[in-house]
């Protein structure tokens, strides 16, 4: 009888380890959109910037002022409102983002219209519409 709790704990630990090693079953589209959404939800805009299409990042690099503005924002909600494929294999997505300005503590909501393109060479989706514009209502 004394061995049963130890056996149970060992079995649970093995099951948890097996779950942690299970390969991702998400497709590249869902994986990219989910990871980007997590970055925005946690106000990790440097991580979200990594999802922006590289040519767009070169044309419009983030300025120091823009990075400082992102630091003033705390995202409180990120809700998918709609998603539709595009004829070229990309994706259009509309998201409602709730945020608080850390200085004023005022919450507001913006609607972010995202455009994503599939990159067959990199085998991933890139955000072609840029990061959300928090300067508008």
Label the predicted regions.
Residues 37-41, 45, 50-57, 98-101, ...:
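Sec-exported extracytoplasmic/periplasmic mature domains
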Residues 84-137:
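Exposed beta-sheet edge and beta->alpha loop/turn motif
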